[in-house]
Amino acid sequence: MKGLLRTLGFSFIALSSYAMASEVNYYVIADQARPFQIEQQGEQHSGIVTDIVSAIFAESDYEVKYHTYPFKRMISVLEAGGEENWVTYGSPKWGKVQSENLSEQPIYTVKHVLVSSSKAPFKFNDMQHMQGRSIVLLLGFDYPNLSPFFENGTVNEMRVKDYEAAYRVLQRTPGDTAFVEMESRVVYNIHHLELPMGDFQIQSFSAVIPDYAIYLAFSPKMNPKEQSFINKRLAELKSSGKLDDIIKKYI
C-alpha cells in the first residue's frame, strides 16, 4: 500500500510539474492599448497582439493565462519578475523589460501621427510648427523624442487618462493643442468612440518619432523550448498570411 501511495505521489508531482511547464502567462495593458490589446474589465480579450498569441497557442499543449494591469503597474510587475514564462509585446525602442527578449520576427510596424482639430488646420513639417502649442499625451507612456522640446519650452506637455479625454481636449481647444499617438490607436479609437473622422486633422509625425517595429516580448528567463515554439508558430502565421489577416481585422 505504501509503495502504491509513493508511486501515486511521484505521479502527481510529475503531472504538476508538466502542468506548470505548459503554462504561459500573457500580460495585457488595461484600457490604453487598443487595438493591440482589447479587454473589458479584464475579460473578453481580443486585439492584434492577443489574437496573435491565441493563434500561436491554438491546439497546443500550452495553457494561456491572462493578467491585466494598468500600464505602469504592468511594467512594475514584469520588472519584479512577473509570473514564469510571460509574454506581452514590446520593441527595442521602448527599453526596459519590454525590450530585453523579443521574438525573432516583428509583428507590426508602428507609425506615429499628430492629431489636431480640423476646425483650425495647420501644416506640420517640424516642431517649430508646434511653437507655443500644447502636445497631449496619454498618462504613463514615455516619449524620449519629445522631451527636449518640453524642456526648452518649444511646446507644453499635457497628460490625459484616455483617448476620450484626448479627443475632447482637441475639440475644445482647436489650434492650440495636438495629440501624439500611434496611428493605429488613433484611428481605432476614433471609430470605437463613434466620433466623426472629419473632426480631426491627422498628419505624419515620423519626422520626430521615426517608424519602428514591434515584437512579441518574452520574460528574460523564458524556457528556451517554449520560446522556440512561439517563434516557430509566429513564422508560420507570417508565411501563411494569417498574421496579415489578424491585423486587417482591426486596422
Whereabouts are the PLM-identified features?
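Extracytoplasmic small-molecule ligand-binding "clamshell" domains
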Residues: 22-98, 159-160, 240
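Ligand-binding cleft/hinge of the Venus flytrap
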Residues: 53-61, 105, 129, 139-163, ...
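Acidic, polar ligand-binding/catalytic clefts
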Residues: 66-129, 140-143, 204-208
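Periplasmic-binding protein-like
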Residues: 30-32, 109-112, 195-231, 251
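Extended ligand-binding regions for polar small-molecule ligands
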Residues: 50-60, 133, 215-246
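Bacterial N-terminal signal peptides that target proteins for export
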Residues: 1-8
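Sec/Tat signal peptide C-region and signal peptidase I cleavage site
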Residues: 15-23
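Short helices/loops that flank or line small-molecule/ion binding pockets
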Residues: 72-84, 101-102, 163-187
